[in-house]
Amino acid sequence: MLIPSKLSRPVRLDHTVVRERLLAKLSGANNFRLALITSPAGYGKTTLISQWAAGKNDIGWYSLDEGNNQQERFASYLIAAVQQATNGHCAICETMEQKRQYASLTSLFAQLFIELAEWHSPLYLVIDDYHLITNPVIHESMRFFIRHQPENLTLVVLSRNLPQLGIANLRVRDQLLEIGSQKLAFTHQEAKQFFDCRLSSPIEAAESSRICDDVSGWATALQLIALSARQNTHSAHKSARRLAGINASHLSDYLVDEVLDNVDLATRHFLLKSAILRSMNDALITRVTGEENGQMRLEEIERQGLFLQRMDDTGEWFCYHPLFGNFLRQRCQWELAAELPEIHRAAAESWMAQGFPSEAIHHALAAGDALMLRDILLNHAWSLFNHSELSLLEESLKALPWDSLLENPQLVLLQAWLMQSQHRYGEVNTLLARAEHEIKDIREGTMHAEFNALRAQVAINDGNQDEAERLAKLALEELPPGWFYSRIVATSVLGEVLHCKGELTRSLALVQQTEQMARQHDVWHYALWSLIQQSEILFAQGFLQTAWETQEKAFQLINEQHLEQLPMHEFLVRIRAQLLWTWARLDEAEASARSGIEVLSSYQPQQQLQCLAMLIQCSLARGDLDNARSQLNRLENLLGNGKYHSDWISNANKVRVIYWQMTGDKAAAANWLRHTAKPEFANNHFLQGQWRNIARAQILLGEFEPAEIVLEELNENARSLRLMSDLNRNLLLLNQLYWQAGRKSDAQRVLLDALKLANRTGFISHFVIEGEAMAQQLRQLIQLNTLPELEQHRAQRILREINQHHRHKFAHFDENFVERLLNHPEVPELIRTSPLTQREWQVLGLIYSGYSNEQIAGELEVAATTIKTHIRNLYQKLGVAHRQAAVQHAQKLLKMMGYGV
């Protein structure tokens, strides 16, 4: 819940000097990206901008305090301020912020700018007291904000110092409007106008000018002088001489003498007590100070000129001028030290009564009241956790004694989930083990079950499947039906365990159950995770179309619940890329992988490993080895600078081994084979993939016998576990083994099996990646004309893809190739004496690549009759009588030129 006063522009007070010269300068603010108002405290920054903002509608105001250094809270108020300025225009961004469904502040701002692109009128966002921000992440995010904000948006920042916002760059590009303390200082005319408004007896212009010069136009000093003059303690000039040369950090003695010592004791105590509140209203004042009519007292303090300012148009919320408020809080610690804990307790109770637990926690911490803090957390901690108030919760839990946590195991569980959310897995188990050791009877019942559900999640994250399964089952046995969150967690973990163990049918049922439970209770991140798991399982089972449809449901969920910036979104677009790659939709697969990298742009580069491997896979399928090599350099750098899950490493190794196969790099393959992990089992698609990498490297090195043993065992496991996609991949690799070993009939047998299975999986690129060896076999099968219709159609499609992406390496008779061929000493004399035309060479290449006459005509964009003429001519020149002889002739020429066909 947001405090309204922090989103309200200060009310323009009576008796303030209208700064016409500065307002004129600000009138052109819409021409700049940033308007920066900087000066020490008390120079009238906020008053000036509130005057400028008067009458403007499209303006949001965000008043910072010390609590806004947390990223999540900063985002909450900033987005609320934008919504205030745009009358709720950025609904998607607001929902993402409220549900904490964004990866970082920069990604949240990126979504904000997408929505603001449809807002065409000038827009202003004011951030007051920016000097209170010390969080470097917020600074970096605001630099991003300024770089990318729409042209019609102007950011107005008020700060006591120069903020870390890339000011120099903006200044050079003339995108910065600056007003500093020299410009903010009152002129002689403004000082005279100020005193005329404040004093019952006006002072002479010359006297006013001398006073103004004595304090260098410092507005707060002028206000203190006027206050002293009204109280008749000193002459205005005497006060000015005393204030001359001092600054905001040396005001304490003066404020004691000239303000606190000149009010009655009741007012003094009111000022000191109320100052502990960062913002205040009638109810808070009544509870904290004991005054019966808080609103009336606030208005009276305001009339006395005691640095109290209204924070909203309704006059409900007030705050002290920051300079005076800090002074009062310091004095309160000295003068009311014994009462201070009780004052903070009263403030906490009042904030709680108004529904602001975060502010209540602030005061409970200040009071050092562990019991009050405990009670607030017991009632509101999980809500704060779900709203990502992690820093506040961590500070609060650290403030509680261990005995208090033991007496309230729910708080131990909360602390453990906090650690889990921060990936501190080792600390989770240590904390829970210590709690179980010290809490009597905790080893049974609901709380123990909740502990086990969390432990199960930690175990599966750590790759410990057996322990995760044991703990998840225990949790589900002990959890009551109403404990939905822990039941969702345990069910999800159990489904993931079965997935890892290859029990796909049972796993699918559990993750579908998880989805239903998560949707029912609005636990959207688990609903999304379950859909991703379902898609992976269906893919492994060979039901790729159903996997696609499940992914569509996941994308719909992301759009409906604004989950675009969760890291899981990257997982979804990555498995979509894998599916698209499988179906040879390479451009779409590449775009999807790149969007995954974009989702992870705010995370460490190591997180992008999987998407980078997918991009390399696309390059390899296209035969673009130069691009693949460039991307592989980056991938290998990431591998050497991070710690990854085994299936991440397996996917990365897959593209490396395929690249070595395509380039014939046996040394790299042999070195990798010596050091790579050899899993104990192959009962899921992760482990199958790593063993396939090993077999591919062995085939490249000519180690056919051990590779065959590996692949036969993989196939046995894949068939028993119904890992149909893995079976399809294994058959293709076994085909390559047989082909290279010269076992042509075995190669044809498993290729026919692979083509038949591909009717179910839809595989295309897995065939294409095998290159010319696959192309030769498919040409032979097509020419035999014995394939069933579906297999025939798929074989032709695969051959077209190979020709499209790989022809330049083995079947494209371009001009340079032909020139080298004709100059080769072993070229047949018939070709030398009766050379083919360039078009006839092209036709020969397409015949060799398996194209029919109609396909050749389409490729070269000529009539079919013209192609027949070209074929007749080239047959005559080559001395061949039919198509198969022409293919064999082309193959001899390619071998002569050094192509391994």
UniProtKB/Swiss-Prot annotation:
Binding site for ATP: 39-46
Residue ranges flagged as DNA-binding region: 853-872
A GO molecular-function descriptor: ATP binding
Domain called HTH luxR-type: residue spans: 829-894
GO biological process: positive regulation of carbohydrate metabolic process; positive regulation of DNA-templated transcription
Record has DNA-binding as a keyword: yes
Keyword field contains Nucleotide-binding: yes
Record keywords: Activator, ATP-binding, Carbohydrate metabolism, DNA-binding, Nucleotide-binding, Transcription, Transcription regulation
Notes on activation and inhibition: Activated by ATP and maltotriose, which are both required for DNA binding.
Function recorded in the entry: Positively regulates the transcription of the maltose regulon whose gene products are responsible for uptake and catabolism of malto-oligosaccharides. Specifically binds to the promoter region of its target genes, recognizing a short DNA motif called the MalT box.
Family matches, as HAMAP family: HTH_type_MalT
Subunit-level organization: Monomer in solution. Oligomerizes to an active state in the presence of the positive effectors ATP and maltotriose.
Family of this protein: Belongs to the MalT family.
NCBIfam families cross-referenced by the UniProt entry: PRK04841.1 (NF003420)
UniProt-recorded name of the protein: HTH-type transcriptional regulator MalT
Species for this entry: Shigella flexneri serotype 5b (strain 8401)
